Amino acid sequence: MNKLDYPRRNGTHKVRITILCARNLARKDLFRLPDPFAKVQVDGTGQVYSTEISKSSLDPKWNAHYDLFLGIGDAITITVWNQRKIHKGSGFLGCVRIPAFNIQSLKGAGFQRLDLGKLSPDDDELVRGQIIISLLSKDGPSSGNPLAIVGPSGDVRGPSEDDSSEDSLPEGWEERRTDNGRVYYVNHATKSTQWDRPRQPGVVGSSHATSPQQRHNTHNGNSGDRQAPAGPTRSTTCTNLMNNGHRSRDLSVTASDERRHSTEILSSVGKENTSPTTPVSATTTPGKKTSSSNSSSAGGRTLEQRPTNEPATPTSSTTSASVRLHSNDNHVKTPKHQTNGHAPPESTPTSPTGQQNYVNGNAQNGSTSGNGSGQAAQPQSASNGWTQEDAATTTSPSTTTSPPRHSQSPPTPNISPPASVTPSANGNVHSPNANSTPAGSGGGSRSYTAATPGQRSQRRSSRQQGEESSTRRRSSRGTRNGGTSGGGGGGGSGQRYASAAIAAANQAARPFLDLPPGYEMRTTQQGQVYFYHIPTGVSTWHDPRIPRDFDTQHLTLDAIGPLPSGWEQRKTASGRVYFVDHNNRTTQFTDPRLSGSILQMIRRGTVPPTSAANAGTPAPPSATPATPSAAAAVPPQATPASNATPTTLTTTTNPPHRIVPDLPQGLLEGADLLPKYRRDLVGKLRALRTELQTMQPQSGHCRLEVSRNEIFEESYRLIMKMRAKDMRKRLMVKFKGEEGLDYGGVAREWLHLLSREMLNPQYGLFQYSRDDHYTLQINPDSGVNPDHLSYFHFVGRTLGIAVFHGHCLDGGFTTPFYKQLLNKPITLGDIEGVDPDLHRSLTWMLESNISGIIESTFSVENNSFGALVVHELKPGGASIPVTEENKREYVKLYVNYRFMRGIEQQFLALQKGFCELIPSHLLRPFDERELELVIGGISSIDVNDWRNNTRLKHCTNETTQVLWFWQVVESYSSEMRARLLQFVTGSSRVPLQGFRALQGSTGAVGPRLFTIHLTADVPTQNLPKAHTCFNRIDLPPYETYQLLCDKLTQAVEETCGFAVE
């Protein structure tokens, strides 16, 4: 996995993409398999990641994730390459392009299997196979992607508890595969085919022994031969990315996107919490969706209809809800079966207009799924668990009580719920009485619920939990039905989702990863994370997944582990704990370590069924009244995990909230206000030091012995021989011929002397940014030294050693250099401090009309060792004139050229050495000016701060020698003060916290202040003595001010070395 990190642009959201694996890649060599790797790119932003190389495989597995920063119009392109042939230009294996308008639909939907396509329609490369990915929003706390297992045919599932369900087939059945590898089953007794694996007779609740009546349903009178399903439709796990058949494939999200079985990723579930279930499938017409959301009282289900302006899919998409069955007198009445059964792949005739007509065998009427109108009133089939007679008395599919009976007729597309639910104008959802709206009533249109993002994510979470008994074969996914299923792949999809609705009610299922239905996580402009309830418009600091009476501080460190990288724990003025995310510069009350499993544990152990947190909004009454028989049918453990979270709401009038300029409504009502994210540089540095300390080995030393005369070359040879982990060990430096023992002071002096040599422009590695400004930039002509890239690698390692061990370098770079080190783009404003004249010229060009004034082209002349070299800013730029239309492009290219002119290789070598010690993600909280202070410290010296943070030993503030000492310091120039500070501490730079944070001996707890020690027993002819490891200067008791001034100046300017008298 790449270690690259890219800066976050304004207005972007963070999305984590997981590249799980690829399937059935094209084999282009006869004797060897490819070495595939995948490349992820955000178009137009420069964000590029590459997976590791999978050796010799047509089904590579990477399981790598990357965090992308996506804007509103950003698209994602994923390409697969063969590393063996990429250098020959023939390693392309396929690509997938996910446009911006589909990214939102795929976020949180689990793993998706996408077909690979060509880069352009003119490509002759053979492309085949699929890639399996997932997208997950990372702007809020999440538990990450669940585990996944890819079957031999490319289907994705969670780790099943066992493979006991794959028993031998019943007598008369045979397993076959289609040309594309999909498994289907042939019943030789009835001469029929089906996708779902049949069960042995006698299995409770899921028996698939077909009765004669059922066999009549599944038998096609025209299929006398035993062939594979003719022209099987593509599985709904595959998303068609073809655009006009050839172009780079854009993802086309259909109504079945949220019902694909590839999203059924789950953790293994204990067997003791499972029980037989029977599917109650509900089928929708193309272009419409059905949703299964939990009611707060009896788990009522609402139906969602996609707006008619969304594209309709050419294949049927089916959903289903699972019902936990119990013995009861209320049985679901099964309508008469159809007499014209269909084979699974072909069940939907097509109208001349290109729309698919779905035939209901009960009413013998066809309905066209074009615009949602003209739907005939039809009784419900038993596969939906509803009939026209009992629709008014049964509450919801999740509370239906009936014996395990199945109707083998193809699913009918039209569903009439017992209670129509419609959204009100203000966003709240209201529902009429179930009895007042009989199922299947005429009218031609159906009302629908406006599903919020939180509801969609909850439904996706429910589907992930529900597949407890999934196995490796696609046909055996979910609770199986022995009959045929209509709608091609859609019919199989409906039965695969047979246990989706019970997932949220199963306490043993994997805990949900997203927020409860109706909730959304948002961030204020000041970086404060809060939760917004969409139906009521109420905002709160409190995470709705955590009970209000639960204190997360009760959890031990062993249970939740340490804070993630870049996070810090603080407390408000009232003592409430909150957390600071330095990576994204946000604050929140929710502990980022609370994963889904911990949240599930909290809810199970401490939350009564009626007291789940809902962010201060009372749970509304259920939209569907529950009958006593329906309520009794719900077992105690079937209480939804988020039962107090509103999912369907009655029509209410929201009370007016006071409008706060900088905070949403409702956030000031609580007792504690979440602090804003502050640009606390000291706090960031403290967090960085904590992270670096965890990376430092507990034993061993990084030993360097160099001479003062050859400090540059000897340091270069020693450091370039070391490994990165050796440089992270405790640094110990010794100068040859000196007796100084390094407790930090010798290392500071070594870095001070080395940085002055290393950054000296006379060596040709760096140059001053301009004549009157002594900031440094990389010299584009450093190539005169054939080993210059190795030296830049050494410079990067030296910068990393200084930062890792808490030291400062004596030298400063330009602001664009630090921005490049942070992987931030360079803008026109960055050039002002480096070249003011050029900045004024380019700014005037942007603000003025240059037509007929400037005759420049997209090329620049550069003087390299006396020779004029023309550099084209873009291909063919010498012949492209700069006009009013393209001047902004010219300025952008020119600014990039000004700072990257001939230094790309040098900077990459330097950055490589730096990142070997300091991972780039640790520097994300810092900007370029803060990084400058981290590397170089503060060059200006504040005498008052120095005096106020000085410790006195064997003297007081009123001692004569101490008063004289400060008089001498005040009389010194800035350069002499820096040399005095370097003489005493080993470094001429002040830490960014000031003199109160001067670092003392290595391993000391806390800082060590500057110390003046008056040595009374030392002759006054001696010079002052410095102890750099302890930041201490020993002053003899000089008799006069002038003597003290002369001796101190002589010691600063002329002494050199340790233990030298």
From Swiss-Prot:
The modification Phosphothreonine is found at residue 412. Pathway: Protein modification; protein ubiquitination. GO terms for biological process: embryonic development via the syncytial blastoderm; embryonic hindgut morphogenesis; germarium-derived egg chamber formation; male gamete generation; negative regulation of BMP signaling pathway; negative regulation of hippo signaling; negative regulation of smoothened signaling pathway; positive regulation of receptor-mediated endocytosis. The modification Phosphoserine is found at residues 262, 416. Residues 207-225, 233-255, 264-273, 348-359, 379-392, 417-439 have a biased composition (Polar residues). It holds the Pfam family WW. Residues 1-116 form the C2 domain. One of its GO terms (molecular function) is ubiquitin-protein transferase activity. Residues 480-494 have a biased composition (Gly residues). Keywords: Developmental protein, Phosphoprotein, Repeat, Transferase, Ubl conjugation pathway. Changing residue 1029 to A: Abolishes enzymatic activity; no change in interaction with MAD. Disruption phenotype: Flies exhibit lethal defects in hindgut morphogenesis. Residues 274-300, 311-322, 360-378, 393-409, 608-617, 624-656 have a biased composition (Low complexity). PROSITE patterns: C2 (PS50004), HECT (PS50237), WW_DOMAIN_1 (PS01159), WW_DOMAIN_2 (PS50020). Residues 167-200, 513-546, 561-594 form the WW domain. Residues 143-176, 188-496, 608-661 are annotated as: Disordered. Residues 723-1061 form the HECT domain. The active site is at 1029 (glycyl thioester intermediate). One of its GO terms (cellular component) is cytosol. Its EC number is 2.3.2.26. It catalyses: S-ubiquitinyl-[E2 ubiquitin-conjugating enzyme]-L-cysteine + [acceptor protein]-L-lysine = [E2 ubiquitin-conjugating enzyme]-L-cysteine + N(6)-ubiquitinyl-[acceptor protein]-L-lysine. E3 ubiquitin-protein ligase which accepts ubiquitin from an E2 ubiquitin-conjugating enzyme in the form of a thioester and then directly transfers the ubiquitin to targeted substrates. Down-regulates Dpp signaling after gastrulation by promoting MAD ubiquitination and subsequent degradation. This is E3 ubiquitin-protein ligase Smurf1. It comes from Drosophila melanogaster.
